[in-house]
Regions:
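Catalytic alpha-helical scaffold of carbohydrate-active enzymes acting on polysaccharides/glycoconjugates
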Residues: 1-147, 152-192, 210-232, 239-298
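Positively charged, amphipathic and often flexible ligand-engagement surfaces
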Residues: 193-207
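Short, glycine-/Ser/Thr-/acidic-enriched flexible segments
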Residues: 199, 237-239
């Protein structure tokens, strides 16, 4: 029926070392193509605890069992333990995924630092953070990255412009309903934004009686009779670990519905850029997620 683009955000050292290879094995069993987006610098997961005073944050973490999914040690990075350098400590794990034939791209340099700061930062700060991740990616993989997917769907105008400056043809930095060309400062950029179109597991778990036993069926309702291509974002720390059985149910369900699995690059190759609409960079809220993020206007 349609393509399901599988986009994996890798936020942490543990996710890179444990969740990523677990997902690779799952994808092999399903003959599924996918795109891995890596965090390439320090793991400061513990800094996220400062979000406790943000509206909706406590409600979200109470639904998704943060300690169970991330582990106590992981939550101490940047608080009681120094943040390990993911790109140094897990270089072999990242290279193995690339060598296995999966598409790889940039998620961020420092996940929590980017997510909590980028919206209000200037062009110089943004360029420094993005160039660190770009240089590290080349160090690890020996070639420039082809795509980008922002941490927490958080960006600013300069970040979108940097994607153009890198020569990337496509990225997935927000939420929405279909591919489009982003407009910044009245100027239409060159790269295509392919937003996440489906809800993530952690956004629906714990809502209206949805749990690990029925969440796959809930997500599958969005694609049961929908002929349009979709972008699904998953996390190495969730679907690659405790939620792996649920994710396998999703993959089996999508295959039974007649869908195929694709990388971001596969999806981009099917698009006619000249026919795509343009939309200004916009912020908004998504059910099940605290705070504002990049959204595609309706």
């Amino acid at each position: 029926m349609a393509r399901i683009v599988l986009k994996i955000d890798v936020d942490t050292l543990r996710g890179t070392r444990e969740g990523v290879p677990n997902l690779a094995r799952i994808f092999d069993r399903f003959s599924a193509r996918a795109t891995f987006l890596f965090s390439l610098g320090p793991d400061h997961t513990g800094w996220a605890l400062r979000r406790v005073f943000r509206p909706g944050f406590l409600k979200k973490v109470s639904r998704t069992s943060v300690v169970e999914h991330y582990g106590v040690k992981q939550l101490m990075y940047g608080v009681l333990l120094p943040g390990p350098d993911i790109g140094r400590r897990a270089i072999a794990d990242m290279r193995a995924i690339h060598e296995a034939g999966f598409e790889c791209g940039i998620h961020t340099w420092d996940h929590v630092y980017w997510q909590d700061n980028v919206r209000m930062r200037d062009r110089d700060w943004t360029a420094r953070e993005m160039q660190k991740s770009h240089a590290r990616f080349i160090d690890i993989f020996g070639a420039p990255p082809v795509t980008h997917g922002a941490a927490g769907w958080q960006m600013n105008d300069a970040a979108f412009e940097q994607i153009d400056a890198w020569g990337m043809r496509y990225a997935s930095d927000g939420r929405g309903h279909s591919p489009y060309l982003p407009v910044v400062g009245g100027r239409t950029l060159s790269h295509v934004q392919m937003p996440t179109t489906l809800p993530t597991l952690d956004e629906v778990l714990g809502i209206d009686g949805i749990d690990t036993h029925n969440v796959a069926a809930h997500i599958l309702k969005f694609t049961e009779t929908n002929p349009h291509d979709q972008v699904f974002t998953l996390h190495a720390e969730l679907e690659g670990q405790k939620l792996a059985p649920v994710f396998e149910q999703l993959l089996a369900g999508w295959r039974a519905q007649g869908h195929t699995f694709a990388t971001m690059g596969d999806y981009h190759a099917t698009l006619d850029r000249d026919s795509l609409p343009s939309y200004p960079v916009t912020w908004g809220e998504i059910p099940g997620r605290s705070g504002e993020l990049i959204v595609q206007p309706d």
